[in-house]
Amino acid sequence: MDAEAARSYSLEQVQALYSFPFQQMMAEVPNMAVTTGQQVPAVAPNMATVTEQQVPEDAPVQEPAPEAPKRRKRKPRAAEPQEPVEPKKPATSKKSGKSTKSKEKQEKITDAFKVKRKVDRFNGVSEAELLTKTLPDILTFNLDIVIIGINPGLMAAYKGHHYPGPGNHFWKCLFMSGLSEVQLNHMDDHTLPGKYGIGFTNMVERTTPGSKDLSSKEFREGGRILVQKLQKYQPRIAVFNGKCIYEIFSKEVFGVKVKNLEFGLQPHKIPDTETLCYVMPSSSARCAQFPRAQDKVHYYIKLKDLRDQLKGIERNADVQEVQYTFDLQLAQEDAKKMAVKEEKYDPGYEAAYGGAYGENPCNGEPCGIASNGLTAHSAEPRGEAAPSDVPNGQWMAQSFAEQIPSFNNCGTREQEEESHA
């Protein structure tokens, strides 16, 4: 009886503390009594104290039971930040892919540039080697004209001749003005002193890709050396091929900074000589003020007249330039429409390589301009030649030839009537 009283007393306390699970515990009590029937009397006297001590210890054990699922939920939360970490790796790989693509693009670009650089203008000769070369002067005594350039370019140093560029207008203007009887090219530069009294020199001897690579010190020294050359050979006319050259020369030699420089004869002479100074437009095709060769011929014609005047040669009244007008806008439009390709490339420069230009363009028939300087119109009357009839596709078109008078000592009656009109 005492054991039963103690068991009921302990159950009442447990029921007071745990009201909700009381029914479940009551269902398990008979089984506990059966299994522990022999041990209960020994533990019964201290049962009250044991239950009193165990109840508060068991209470906190059941309290975190609802928190256990929270911990389980936290585990996936803790794992959630790891999930985006895995896609970050392919993100970095994407960046690397972009970088590889950009590298591929850069490689393609560099390959394209390498292809352009492989264009061999000088047949294997490096630019550094050309910079060490110089262009020899073509000077002698009793010259009528000395053409003065700034300094040799790469092509001139490579060819070893003056004004070798196909786009340069010098040789065309020389022929169109009548200073030479036939069309010449850079390979004929050494023959000009004996045939036409024309020589060549430069203000600075050093070869550069452009005149901008020269220093002011080189211009000063070059100006002094040029004066010494002109004082030695004393030509009749010193022709400066471009305004820029004469402006530098005038400042260094005469001490005069020219303002509003005009082409043609200048007021100053070379010191201690009777050599006149004459300024022409640059024969380079890059001259924006005169984009075509025919725009520069006027100043070559005036140079020829000045030379004849100094030599005492009477001018032909039938063949002379009465009036000259120039419209830059019309010239630029005309150059774009008609003469752009012709100005950039001249078949005449193939003569050095045994090209078609070296052959006789007339083929035994009368030409537009004969070798003796007389026009074909003075020999036999012919119809106007179409531009396609120009031999070997030369640069001079029939439309422009009509604008330039023939430079000969005798003219036809038709030319006389036109000149008087």
Curated annotation (Swiss-Prot):
One Gene Ontology molecular-function label: DNA N-glycosylase activity
Keywords: Activator, Chromatin regulator, DNA damage, DNA repair, Hydrolase, Isopeptide bond, Nucleus, Transcription, Transcription regulation, Ubl conjugation
Residue span of region Disordered: 45-108
Reactions accelerated catalytically: Hydrolyzes mismatched double-stranded DNA and polynucleotides, releasing free thymine
CDD domains given in the database record: UDG-F2_TDG_MUG
This protein's record includes keyword Metal-binding: no
Residues in cross-link Glycyl lysine isopeptide (Lys-Gly) (interchain with G-Cter in SUMO): 341
Biased composition (Basic residues): 91-100
Signal peptide: none
One term under GO cellular component: plasma membrane
Cross-linked residues, Glycyl lysine isopeptide (Lys-Gly) (interchain with G-Cter in SUMO2): 114, 259, 341
Processing and modification events after translation: Sumoylation on Lys-341 by either SUMO1 or SUMO2 induces dissociation of the product DNA.
Pfam families recorded: UDG (PF03167)
Cellular localisation: Nucleus
EC number: 3.2.2.29
Self-association state and partner proteins as the record states: Homodimer. Interacts with AICDA and GADD45A.
Family: Belongs to the uracil-DNA glycosylase (UDG) superfamily. TDG/mug family.
Described function: DNA glycosylase that plays a key role in active DNA demethylation: specifically recognizes and binds 5-formylcytosine (5fC) and 5-carboxylcytosine (5caC) in the context of CpG sites and mediates their excision through base-excision repair (BER) to install an unmethylated cytosine. Cannot remove 5-hydroxymethylcytosine (5hmC). According to an alternative model, involved in DNA demethylation by mediating DNA glycolase activity toward 5-hydroxymethyluracil (5hmU) produced by deamination of 5hmC.
This protein's name: G/T mismatch-specific thymine DNA glycosylase
The gene coding this protein: Tdg
